[in-house]
Amino acid sequence: MSLVYMNIMTAFTVSLVGLLMYRSHLMSSLLCLEGMMLSLFVMATLTILNSHFTLASMMPIILLVFAACEAALGLSLLVMVSNTYGTDYVQNLNLLQC
């Protein structure tokens, strides 16, 4: 494995550990999820470019679409929770009812 792949895997691992450790605030969780999605995007792009696998060249774009949808839903949930309760604690999400 080259140094670039090791750095990307380290970025993914740090984001995953951050997601597992700092779960109290919704904003911290969303930032860690974005870091994970960014490292997955870079890893998929580099893997496809290095292997010349042209059939899967759309996969990073699809991953970016899912990341954008996840970010939009997460931010809308963050705005709704912070307007309702005044804080962005994840424990307030258990109180939400449809």
UniProtKB/Swiss-Prot annotation:
Transmembrane stretches, start-end: 1-21, 29-49, 61-81
Cellular compartments annotated: Mitochondrion inner membrane
Statement: the UniProt record of this protein carries the keyword ATP-binding: no
Family annotation (Gene3D superfamilies): 1.10.287.3510
GO biological process: ATP synthesis coupled electron transport
Membrane topology: Multi-pass membrane protein
Main enzyme class: translocase
This protein's UniProt keywords: Electron transport, Membrane, Mitochondrion, Mitochondrion inner membrane, NAD, Respiratory chain, Translocase, Transmembrane, Transmembrane helix, Transport, Ubiquinone
GO molecular function: NADH dehydrogenase (ubiquinone) activity
Assigned GO CC terms: mitochondrial inner membrane; respiratory chain complex I
Pfam families (alphabetical): Oxidored_q2
Family: Belongs to the complex I subunit 4L family.
Assembly mode: Core subunit of respiratory chain NADH dehydrogenase (Complex I) which is composed of 45 different subunits.
Name of the molecule in the record: NADH-ubiquinone oxidoreductase chain 4L
